[in-house]
Amino acid sequence: MSKLYDSIEELIIELEDEDGDPVGGRTVAIIPGAFKPPHLGHLDMVRQYAEQADEVIVLISSPLRASRVILGQPISTRKSMEIWEMLLDDAGISDVKLEVSPKPSPVAATYDYIDENSPLEPGTKIILGASQKGGDFKRWRSAAKYVNPALELLPPEETAVIPANRPSGEPYSATDARKMLEQDENADEFFGEGRTETVRSILGLDSQIDEMSAMAGGAVQGYGAPLGTKKRKKKKQSEYNELY
């Protein structure tokens, strides 16, 4: 009888060891970006990576200056976070963690997250968010130099996803989303049906539009002599993947 008890005890110990040290570890997808603002194109990327990974981490970087504004209102990391929460809740997507990085660029934020001080458990497989469009995955060509040796980086060129397009067939663009919000147009195609006003409220645009309307009304009532306006030369912006 004692031999039977010994055998059972050994089996229990083996099972406990297996539970404590799972074979293969977890897979975590990291999707970095400034997200100014986040939109359904970003959400689709999260959805695709959620099918490949056990958990998706959306890493919001913190630019040194407010380079993206709408009607004078900067799109802060807090506002980006609120819009993300709305999008994820509407889509019913769980297993997504929203985190803010103090680093100014998405790439720097990612390297900081996966380095020797990474909060990820040893043995975790890492997917770095990237689009198949335009060789976007090449941004991670140096990632192997920064990743914690205890983590396993999956090849970005193999895990990159196909970017979604808007209903019109046009690619999603944060620039276009900002422009539509600035011009007080319906931007539901970027944020979901009936969500334009919610996004305006999060970004603090409602009060700005009301103030501009009041100022315009006052200008019409008062005397206004024609003023010559000098056109400002528009600065050319460097091209970058607006998916992020």
Which residues does each predicted region cover?
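Short interaction-hotspot residues at assembly and binding interfaces
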Residues: G218-Y244
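Nucleotidyltransferase catalytic core that binds NTPs
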Residues: S2-D210, A214, G222-A225, E242
